[in-house]
């Protein structure tokens, strides 16, 4: 398998087809605005985001985690708030899709169809890895620019602190998946 990484420019996006974006090291909000704009401008374009767990949220790690925990538990009800809602995602792929959804006009047909054309995955799925030639795009404007005293955390770290059981289950599945991927690559 041949993996090529290229910078992605919104003016050079194809009008139709599929674009795979590697989210590793990107700031979540910046990448989400870029993707939302591309989905709205090109109605026949599908965007696949991989490595969503490596997206970055800037800010103090404790502050970000406490904000997520407060958002999850702030709805006080007499019965189970998880059944009633609002539903707050915990997994990185769902968190990112929710961020993009917030930037789309989800009540209109264009926004709903744009959201249907977005796929977000944690790590890279096997069906994408098995392609002969894989082009992963990066958005230079959305990459994290490291500077002194910059504080940030990844969505995976947030998920690990919010829901450690689900994170541990996913981590074990990734190890099994990695072994299968090595077998596919070698044989």
Curated annotation (Swiss-Prot):
Keyword terms: Ribonucleoprotein, Ribosomal protein
Record's GO cellular component terms: cytosolic large ribosomal subunit; ribosome
GO terms (BP aspect): negative regulation of translation; translation
MF annotations from Gene Ontology: mRNA binding; structural constituent of ribosome
Pfam families attached to this UniProt entry: Ribosomal_L13 (PF00572)
SUPFAM superfamilies in the cross-refs: Ribosomal protein L13
InterPro entries: Ribosomal_uL13, Ribosomal_uL13_bac-type, Ribosomal_uL13_CS, Ribosomal_uL13_euk/arc, Ribosomal_uL13_sf
Membrane-crossing residue ranges in chain numbering: none
Tagged with keyword Ribonucleoprotein: yes
Ribonucleoprotein in keyword set: yes
Subunit structure: Part of the 50S ribosomal subunit.
Family: Belongs to the universal ribosomal protein uL13 family.
Role according to the record: This protein is one of the early assembly proteins of the 50S ribosomal subunit, although it is not seen to bind rRNA by itself. It is important during the early stages of 50S assembly.
Protein name as annotated: Large ribosomal subunit protein uL13
Gene name linked to the record: rpl13
């Amino acid at each position: 398998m041949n993996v090529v990484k290229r910078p992605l420019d919104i003016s050079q996006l194809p009008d139709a087809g599929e674009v795979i974006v590697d989210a590793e090291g990107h700031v979540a909000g910046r990448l989400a605005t870029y993707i939302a704009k591309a989905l709205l401008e090109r109605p026949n374009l599908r965007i696949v985001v991989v490595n969503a767990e490596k997206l970055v949220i800037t800010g103090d790690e404790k502050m970000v985690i406490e904000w997520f925990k407060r958002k999850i538990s702030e709805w006080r009800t007499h019965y189970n708030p998880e059944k009633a809602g609002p539903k707050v995602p915990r997994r990185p792929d769902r968190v990112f899709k929710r961020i993009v959804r917030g930037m789309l006009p989800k009540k209109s047909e264009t926004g709903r169809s744009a959201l249907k054309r977005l796929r977000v995955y944690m790590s890279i799925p096997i069906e994408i890895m098995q392609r002969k030639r894989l082009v992963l795009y990066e958005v230079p404007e959305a990459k994290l620019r490291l500077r002194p005293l910059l504080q940030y955390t990844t969505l995976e770290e947030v998920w690990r602190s919010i829901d450690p059981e689900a994170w541990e289950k996913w981590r074990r599945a990734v190890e099994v998946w990695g072994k299968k991927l090595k077998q596919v690559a070698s044989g």
